[in-house]
């Protein structure tokens, strides 16, 4: 059973053009979009219709959404991007920093703002208005990108971790595990303690083809956790966001942070609709993909 509250509609029409490189799969197109700082972001597209961009969560890459693409493709030109440092996207820029001893070292220049700019850059590369679906931390980036470009006509946010919590202690423990060669344990620790994904959901994730990539890329998660711990939710800003938004949540999601974030968005966004997937947690798209895709499609198509 799905609980619904009601909402609105409205679109901003803008146009742009982009060219893609065709892959061996004639239904799939892969391109690279340069973000504001020059980082190349990989995007894979399929289908026909208005553009729908999917922004994945904290671990994994665009392949995480491949099972859902055929469900969206009849209705949209659906594009799944690799966030910086994930999949085929570049990690991001480094800058030379001179110390007090005049020693020059290379330093990572990562920031959440650059993730916002990445999403906005991909959106701006697409023709016409763009729908954006963001899962978990990808939802934070999708939301903030809507303040950087007017081309986002609708948002779908699935449990973005927006609340002001410091998780650097978790990041420290994960870093020690990685240094000890316990990469998979570091990933499981993240999944259990931050989004509080259930053991059953983690077991299901381990069976997915994307799991080895999640383990291999767990280092990137450290910088994201540290940066997200500095993020501050601004309800006043959210009240000014004039973009129709579908908020998605699972009734069995255990994380108080994720629950509070959805409630905060419900209370502040002027044009929002909430759908709660009964019996589901943080990864409903894995267990009920058809229902998930139908819910998103109906909202984006104006049927709700």
Language-model features: locations:
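Helix-rich cap/lid subdomain of alpha/beta-hydrolase
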Residues: 160-209, 222-227
């Amino acid at each position: 059973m799905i609980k619904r509250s009601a909402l609105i509609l409205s679109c901003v029409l803008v146009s742009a053009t982009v060219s893609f490189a065709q892959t061996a799969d004639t239904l799939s197109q892969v391109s690279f979009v340069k973000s504001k700082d020059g980082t190349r972001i990989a995007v894979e597209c399929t289908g026909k219709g208005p553009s729908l961009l999917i922004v994945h969560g904290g671990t994994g890459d665009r392949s995480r959404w491949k099972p859902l693409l055929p469900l969206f493709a009849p209705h949209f030109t659906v594009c799944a991007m690799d966030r910086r440092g994930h999949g085929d996207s570049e990690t991001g820029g480094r800058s030379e920093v001179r110390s007090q001893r005049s020693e020059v070292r290379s330093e990572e220049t990562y920031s959440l703002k650059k993730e916002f700019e990445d999403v906005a850059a991909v959106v701006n590369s697409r023709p016409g208005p763009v729908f954006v679906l963001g899962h978990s931390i990808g939802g934070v980036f999708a939301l903030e990108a809507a303040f950087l470009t007017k081309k986002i006509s609708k948002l779908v946010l699935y449990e973005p971790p927006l609340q002001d919590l410091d998780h650097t202690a978790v990041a420290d423990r994960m870093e020690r595990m990685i240094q000890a060669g316990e990469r998979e344990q570091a990933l499981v620790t993240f999944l259990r303690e931050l989004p509080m994904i259930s053991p059953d959901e983690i077991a299901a994730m381990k069976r997915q083809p994307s799991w080895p990539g999640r383990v291999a890329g767990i280092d990137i998660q450290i910088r994201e956790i540290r940066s997200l711990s500095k993020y501050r939710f601004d309800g006043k800003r959210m009240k000014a966001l004039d973009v129709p938004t579908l908020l998605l949540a699972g009734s069995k999601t255990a994380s108080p942070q994720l629950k509070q974030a959805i409630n905060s968005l419900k209370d502040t966004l002027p044009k929002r609709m909430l759908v709660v997937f009964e019996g589901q947690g943080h990864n409903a798209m894995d267990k009920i993909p058809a229902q998930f895709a139908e819910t998103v499609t109906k909202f984006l198509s104006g049927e709700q």
